[in-house]
Amino acid sequence: RRENYRLSLSVSPAATVHVDDGDGRDPAASCLRVLDISGGGVALAVPDAAVSMFQPNVRLPPCLLRLDDAEPLPVAIEVAYAARHEVRGNVAWWRAGCRFVDLPAAIEQQVMQFLFRTERHRNARQRRGG
């Protein structure tokens, strides 16, 4: 049972997690789209080539969470699960459920503000019929 409200994200607003894997790869290769987010963690879209990093109970290297155009937030993330999500253009994508570890209260507050702001914008759009 979930302790936190979880918000599914579409392409907009943009939320990404940058994983510093330390191997000197192109930074874009380690920039992962957030599929959903809560105060307790994120689900990430992970390309097939990177899924080996996303094994259950593995704590990822230092990560930066970017919510819309705000400054990136440093977060510690531990993988809860990884499951095949979809295939797009002959490339398999995985859904990796991850929990925040020792999230500072100030960063948790910023995540929650993003959730509420995004939900308010969605509700306003729906009321306008869009």
Language-model regions, residue ranges each:
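Structured alpha-helical
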Residues: 1-130
